[in-house]
């Protein structure tokens, strides 16, 4: 949020020479995080008001003029191509040294004395867009020069002085104000500054509510819980015109765009008080105003003419004919201010925070008003906003007349009252503060304080009673921040720590991530805990039993993650555009509706939240066998490298997303813990994967059992060479490598040190129903170098064993 220091000075008497760095620091330490303090006037250095005395045609350019311009004490020639130049016109002149954007585009450039088409030019006559004032002085013409003739500023006046731009703008981090609805306006920030420095505050003038309702206008609130207060004021004898410059520039400084006087009054009041308001064209309201929930099938007509279907959970502003706006979020076309508007109804209301938040999220339309309503505004602030609004209307429209004022306040806010023992406060703060000191500081913030022995009774002001301050700890925080956190002395705490608990599941997760990322070269991804409906339908092929969010980020993302695979496939689609081959993985919780009972509160029924690990291997290569072996190898070797119980593979239940042939279920003992399969072609197409084959695996990480301990054994490096001996065998097509490897491992020989898979081949040179299987034997002795005959003898023994079990024969 942007805060104007000049605006703050309207409400609190800050010294003219106030230390701005200290102010920003004190606010940050006590109240809100001030991210930056910008001297707005510094952007307009070396810029002055100039008066064009004469205009002559440029001798060498048809579209350029030579303007003799009074810049205060002297007249200079300035070449300009503006379309609206005239003699006697006041303009913004950027002198040499000023920084501007040429036609408002690109980076800032330094203005220098130059020669344009043979004529000397001392500086530049500027359009609003070239000095960053396009929103304050909008124009549709590119060559339009900023006309300052209406400003009472003689030639040579610094532009920042003439346009009231000498101001300090504080940039406040909105996150630091999330629980402080009282700070979303200049008056709330001023109140904090006044309390910090014990300065007096200026109050808004009071508007007399004794108004005769001559128009018969009235308001009905049907849902008092969603709308605790609604004030409506009917005002006649107004018109659409520009707001005065002082109002426009304040609105612009704080990041909004001035529109017209009627709309700008509502913007100004919101920026001043933090209370949103809305002006309706009274001639377009049929009957009276009703605050109610939308009915099934109702729509809101937007300014662009589109019809917005509404939810029955939406709180609306309606008249006798239908919906005119979404309460606290946005208005519709029917109620909008038009050039012919002469009579308005001013709405200043209080709405339930949660309802506004749901509606704003539902339609992805978070406005300045809804952002404030979402924080739970004090309903008493409607009075302050009404007082200021009426003052502004009477100032801008001296002939205006209030013909109706209705204040529906069915649910008054109850001020919070909290008892805090001073002894408790002392123990928590680690310091004893005198009751008088506490009382003085707290009363500066608007609290009512009384003492009875050790007890301090606190009456919380309404602007802090909307949930912000409700318990003893909140009062402790208020006392501490007003005293100054930096004024508490730090004392070392003596304590003892128990040894760290060995959390095997956390260690297992860390080792899995290290194995997949470092050893296997996979990229870890992080996705949202919700899934897009299109990917759910494509991969899981059903939404049955999947939990959904009551307020999803978008209608298409309402399903809670029940599997990691839909989001993994979405990531494959995004990466397919950039890579021919890649592998990714994710470890995260999945949520399933299994009547899970919280271990912390048995009364609380939650969905199960089990950790899963899933990965995808994607390639444009058509070799499915190689892709399958790569993925299977990664999963198979995981058990060894992360030190957990061995995983095995069977075909028992095909996943719905899997290819009809290339799939396996993953088991730990007799328990199925996951799946490994090629993504079916139709599923790939449904996901939008165009030219890639994708192998997926998913494991229930919580079902994997880490081994509690392990014993590492070490052997000496071999003194004699080890021989790799390749054997190619013809075996039946159904023979699996794992069975061959198991047979080789069962051979008792001190010279045989292992066997590794090399290749598998089916083709023209191999008989039908057979396949060629190549394995590599590691043969050697720890005592000597083996002869060729000894090596052949070991290899023959292996061949005979395999031939006996599988009917294999040596392929020649």
Predicted features and spans:
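A carboxyl-terminal module marker
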Residues: 2, 22, 427, 444-447, ...
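Phosphate-backbone binding interfaces of nucleic-acid-interacting proteins
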Residues: 1-207, 345, 362-364, 368, ...
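Terminal amphipathic helices with adjacent charged low-complexity linkers/tails
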Residues: 195-222, 397-425, 432, 475
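Glycine/proline-enriched, intrinsically flexible loops and inter-domain linkers
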Residues: 4, 11, 25, 65, ...
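Extended, well-folded interaction surfaces typified by the phenylalanyl-tRNA synthetase beta subunit core
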Residues: 418-582, 778-782, 790-812
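Conserved catalytic alpha/beta cores of large enzymes that bind or transform nucleotide phosphates
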Residues: 129, 240, 308, 312-414
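Short, hydrophobic beta-strand segments
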Residues: 4-10, 167-176, 228-236, 368-375, ...
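Conserved mixed alpha/beta core segments that line enzyme active sites in large multi-domain catalysts
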Residues: 48-79, 266-334
């Amino acid at each position: 949020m942007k805060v104007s220091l000049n605006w703050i000075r309207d409400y609190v008497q800050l010294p003219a020479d106030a230390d701005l760095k200290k102010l920003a620091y004190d606010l940050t330490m006590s109240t809100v995080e001030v991210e930056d303090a910008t001297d707005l006037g510094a952007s307009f250095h070396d810029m002055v008001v100039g008066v064009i005395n004469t205009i002559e045609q440029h001798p060498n350019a048809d579209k350029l003029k030579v303007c003799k311009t009074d810049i205060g004490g002297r007249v200079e020639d300035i070449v300009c191509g503006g379309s609206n130049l005239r003699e006697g016109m006041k303009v913004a002149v950027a002198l040499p040294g000023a920084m501007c954007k040429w036609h408002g585009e690109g980076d800032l450039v330094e203005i220098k004395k130059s020669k344009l088409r043979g004529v000397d030019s001392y500086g530049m006559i500027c359009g609003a867009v070239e000095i960053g004032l396009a929103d304050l002085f909008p124009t549709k013409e590119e060559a339009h020069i900023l006309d300052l003739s209406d400003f009472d500023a003689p030639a040579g006046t610094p532009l920042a002085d003439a346009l009231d731009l000498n101001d300090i703008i504080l940039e406040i981090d909105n996150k630091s104000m999330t629980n402080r609805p009282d700070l979303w306006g200049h008056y709330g920030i001023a109140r904090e500054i006044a309390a910090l420095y014990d300065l007096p505050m200026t109050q808004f003038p009071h508007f007399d509510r004794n108004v005769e309702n001559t128009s018969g206008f009235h308001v009905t609130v049907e849902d008092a819980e969603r709308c605790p207060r609604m004030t409506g004021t009917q005002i006649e004898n107004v018109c659409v015109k520009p707001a005065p410059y002082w109002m426009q520039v304040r609105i612009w400084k704080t990041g909004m765009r001035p529109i017209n006087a009627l709309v700008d009054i509502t913007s100004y009041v919101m920026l001043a008080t933090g209370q949103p308001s809305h002006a309706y064209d009274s001639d377009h309201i049929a009957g009276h105003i009703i605050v109610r929930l939308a009915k099934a099938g109702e729509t809101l007509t937007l300014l662009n003419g589109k019809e917005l279907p509404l939810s029955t959970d939406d709180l609306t502003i309606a008249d006798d004919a239908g919906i005119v706006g979404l309460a606290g979020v946005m208005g519709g076309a029917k109620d909008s201010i038009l050039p012919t508007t002469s009579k308005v109804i001013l709405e200043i209301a209080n709405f339930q925070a949660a309802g506004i938040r749901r509606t704003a999220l539902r339609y992805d339309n978070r406005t300045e008003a809804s952002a404030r309503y979402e924080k739970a505004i004090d309903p008493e602030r409607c009075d302050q906003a009404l007082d200021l609004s009426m003052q502004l209307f009477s100032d801008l429209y001296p002939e205006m007349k209030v013909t109706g004022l209705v204040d529906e306040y069915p649910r008054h806010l109850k001020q919070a009252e909290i008892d805090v023992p001073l002894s408790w406060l002392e123990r928590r703060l680690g310091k004893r503060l005198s009751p008088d000191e506490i009382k003085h500081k707290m009363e500066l913030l608007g609290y009512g304080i009384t003492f009875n022995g050790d007890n301090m009774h606190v009456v919380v002001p309404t602007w802090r009673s909307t949930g912000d301050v409700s318990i003893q700890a909140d009062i402790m925080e208020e006392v501490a921040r007003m005293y100054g956190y930096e004024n508490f002395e730090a004392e070392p705490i003596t304590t003892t720590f128990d040894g760290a608990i060995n959390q095997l599941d956390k260690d297992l997760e860390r080792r899995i991530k290290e194995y997949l990322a470092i050893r296997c070269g996979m990229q870890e991804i992080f996705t949202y805990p919700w899934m897009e409906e299109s990917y759910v339908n494509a991969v899981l092929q059903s939404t049955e039993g999947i939990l959904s969010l009551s307020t999803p980020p978008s209608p298409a993302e309402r399903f809670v993650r029940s599997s990691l695979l839909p989001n993994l496939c979405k990531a494959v689609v995004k990466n397919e555009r950039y890579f021919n081959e890649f592998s990714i993985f994710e470890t995260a919780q999945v949520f399933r509706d299994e009547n899970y009972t919280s271990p912390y509160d048995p009364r609380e029924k939650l969905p199960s939240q089990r950790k899963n690990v899933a990965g995808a291997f994607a390639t444009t290569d058509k070799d499915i066998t190689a892709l399958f072996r790569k993925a299977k190898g990664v999963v198979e070797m995981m058990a060894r490298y992360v030190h957990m119980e061995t995983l095995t593979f069977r075909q028992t239940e095909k996943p719905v997303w899997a290819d009809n042939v290339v799939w396996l279920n993953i088991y730990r003992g007799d328990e199925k813990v996951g799946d490994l399969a090629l993504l079916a072609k139709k599923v790939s197409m449904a996901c939008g994967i165009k030219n890639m084959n994708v192998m997926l695996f998913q494991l229930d990480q919580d079902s994997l059992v880490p081994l509690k301990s392990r014993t590492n054994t070490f052997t000496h490096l071999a003194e004699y060479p080890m021989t790799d001996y390749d054997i190619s065998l013809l075996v039946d097509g159904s023979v699996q490598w794992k069975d061959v490897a198991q047979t080789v491992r069962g051979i008792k020989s001190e010279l045989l040190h292992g066997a590794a898979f090399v290749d598998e081949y089916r083709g023209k040179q191999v008989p039908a129903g057979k396949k060629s299987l190549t394995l590599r034997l590691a043969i050697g002795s720890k005592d000597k170098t083996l002869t060729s005959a000894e090596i052949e003898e070991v290899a023959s023994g292996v061949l005979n064993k395999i031939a006996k079990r599988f009917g294999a024969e040596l392929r020649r």
